[in-house]
Amino acid sequence: MAETIIVRECQFGQVRFMYGDLTKEEGDILVTPANNRLAGREGVDEVVHQAAGPELRKHTHGIAVERRKENLPPCGVGEAVITPPFSLPHSSLIHVVGPDCRRPTQDNDRRELLKAAYASLFERIGEIENRGTIVLPPL
């Protein structure tokens, strides 16, 4: 169980800042910061992929294959994609590709790419009917 650090009431509900394993937190939607290959090979995304089980990796690989047929990355920087949560205790899983601070080619556009990533995230959230609680790590 995660430890609650800060709780704030806001116009649309409650915001909680927590520390712990987000894959075990109750919520309707889990958001994971992903790379543009949707590979789930490092950081929070790796933990999410491991908790979701091998079906998630197979599913994201299928997305990658289909997008590459159109000469597109599986999920471009600033984009988000919804997948089933598989073994996770959430209704939906959203993968969001934010800018990579390790890539100098993204330095000049980092703020715009981050804004685009959050905008895409909120668009995907709007597509999900059951969205009462969102588990969202920093992107």
Q: Which ranges hold each PLM region?
A:
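Macrodomain-like recognition of ADP-ribose-binding/processing modules
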Residues: 1-139
